[in-house]
Amino acid sequence: MITDVDGVLVGHWTDADARTGCTVVRFPEGTVASAEVRGGAPASRELELLAPHRTVSRIDAVVLSGGSAFGLAAADGVMAELEAEGIGFPTAFGVVPIVEGLSLFDLGVGDPTGRPGPVEGRAACRAVAGGAHAVGAVGAGTGATVGKWRGREHATDGGIGASSVRDGEVIVAALIAVNAAGDIDDGSATADPVDLGSLRPSEEAFHDDGSPEMTNTTIGVVATNARLDKNGCLVVAQGGHDGMARALFPPHTTADGDALVAAATQQVDADLDLVRALALIAVERAIRGLGGGLGRR
């Protein structure tokens, strides 16, 4: 789990009736982060701040939420909670918490008016803890589904997946909210030639105006105890997306808003290519741990 990285904490807020929620990942002081978006329809907050050429290097928390772009408001509650704790980027006029937001589209699954907001984000932030955390239909993964590109009748549950891998002292871990248009590829089948007809989404997956019937997005956080700068964290986020591409078929579609934040807590020296490779494995395992769908293609 991502909490295997020392100092990383996770909290969930879940509305099982509305089938939505949010998940907060908090980091220890001094954590550096960057991010990468590969999906065509992202809903995000403050990601540009994590670009390597931007000034601020620190990160305090990431909020993963349902509710599509409405759910980004959950980060307001997390900022308020961290400000009350005195955590954030110091200025002459008080601290400004560095909180990134990523949201997935679950409005068509439960109650579309029940999306997370500031109160729910603050509740998830107050619930953070180390050690084992809940996975599956919880937090941002409560209303998550997969397999929708072949039509609504093929949709199955997604959710929150988690994994961690080690190489000596180096730990890389992932927490992923899986709400993909594509299927979870369990990797069990042999690499047979792809049937090109199977690559065409079902007409039932779209409304008459061409818009998707159920929309999507897989979002998450990769954390490592390695000492990395923002450029290194960007490379790790890219490795995480490679893991997403191994575990989902098809990945990164125009109807997905796939995005990952990669955070480094600066505790041990590590080779960047090793950390990137471990990120690939961690994300792949986190997604596949939610259950199989397709065999590998």
Over which residues does each language-model region extend?
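A structural signal for small-residue-enriched, beta-sheet-centric alpha/beta enzyme cores
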Residues: M1-A69, A73, A80, A84-R297
